[in-house]
């Protein structure tokens, strides 16, 4: 039995010789946060910086005057002076798109010999966005 005892002791010895984890081997995300206040502050600063970045991204705004559906053969007959009748009435508000997504509606205005649009309605989902920092 002494041989069996020795073998089991040798196994214990071999197990104890296994590599002890170092700082590099430990996943720091699994350890408790020492400075949770600093971490929260850093996260808040990151969010504010991200918000500033997003709010400064340029976008394309398109105002849709109207739509019409015609055949290609009719389009090919167009020449200078041809008129295309649109489906929308002049009394209907114009759709305003941001990067292809409907965001608002409004009415056409002329300012200093340029077209403009007076916003008459903003899509509900956009009204809830807080842009103040």
From Swiss-Prot:
Cross-referenced Pfam families: FliMN_C
Membrane-spanning residues: none
Gene3D superfamilies: SpoA-like
Recorded topology in the membrane: Peripheral membrane protein
Keyword Membrane: yes
Annotated segments matching region Disordered: 1-39
CC annotations in GO: bacterial-type flagellum basal body; plasma membrane
Function field: FliN is one of three proteins (FliG, FliN, FliM) that form the rotor-mounted switch complex (C ring), located at the base of the basal body. This complex interacts with the CheY and CheZ chemotaxis proteins, in addition to contacting components of the motor that determine the direction of flagellar rotation.
PANTHER family the record matches: FLAGELLAR MOTOR SWITCH PROTEIN FLIN (PTHR43484:SF1), PTHR43484
Name under which the protein is recorded: Flagellar motor switch protein FliN
């Amino acid at each position: 039995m002494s041989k069996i005892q020795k073998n089991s002791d040798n196994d214990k010895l071999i197990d104890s010789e296994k590599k002890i984890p170092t700082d590099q081997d430990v996943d720091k995300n699994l350890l408790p946060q020492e400075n949770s206040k600093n971490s929260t502050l850093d996260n808040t600063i990151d969010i504010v910086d991200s918000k500033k970045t997003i709010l400064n991204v340029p976008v394309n705004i398109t105002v849709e005057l109207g739509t019409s559906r015609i055949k290609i053969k009719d389009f090919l007959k167009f020449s200078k002076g041809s008129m295309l009748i649109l489906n929308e009435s002049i009394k209907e508000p114009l759709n305003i798109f941001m990067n292809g997504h409907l965001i608002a509606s409004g009415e056409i205005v002329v300012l200093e010999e340029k077209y403009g649009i007076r916003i008459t309605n903003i899509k509900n989902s956009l009204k809830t966005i807080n842009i103040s920092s």
